[in-house]
Design a protein with these regions (language model features):
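Acidic/polar low-complexity segments and flexible, solvent-exposed patches
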Residues: 1-137
Length: 137
């Protein structure tokens, strides 16, 4: 009986340890919209060059920014709000260490960016890096 109790406790501790040492971190995605068809998504977003499209559950999710810092996303958000878009913050867990490290570095740059051109340029690299490093596109 003692062996079984010890094994049970050991397994539970391992489960808790494994959960707490996952490399996932929360990032905030700036969501422009969810579309049920690729045609409607393309029609509504054809003027937006810097975007990330993720297809899941037969829907097309369109994101225009990613950051670990909500204040940085507010900078990006203001660019699209001026164009009349309503945007939403979405929390996403990312477990790609290399991308998370790069995102932290880009967040530092984005925090210091003042002009719209700087913000757009940094944001473009963040989105394309996510496609390349996390989605493997």
């Amino acid at each position: 009986m003692g062996v079984f109790s010890g094994k049970f406790i050991y397994d539970k501790i391992n489960d808790v340890y494994a959960f707490s040492t996952k490399n996932e971190q929360i990032a905030y995605f700036l969501q422009l919209g969810i579309y049920s068809s690729e045609e409607s998504m393309n029609s509504d977003t054809n003027s937006i060059t810097n975007k990330l499209v993720i297809k899941k559950n037969n829907n097309y999710y369109v994101y225009v920014g990613i950051s670990m810092n909500k204040d940085n996303l507010k900078k990006v958000c203001s660019l699209y709000q001026k164009l009349g878009y309503n945007l939403y913050f979405d929390e996403v867990y990312i477990d790609n260490k290399e991308y998370l490290y790069n995102l932290e570095q880009f967040d530092l740059l984005l925090a210091k960016a003042k002009s719209n051109d700087e913000i757009e340029s940094i944001n473009s690299v963040i989105l394309s890096s996510y496609e390349e490093m996390v989605l493997n596109k």
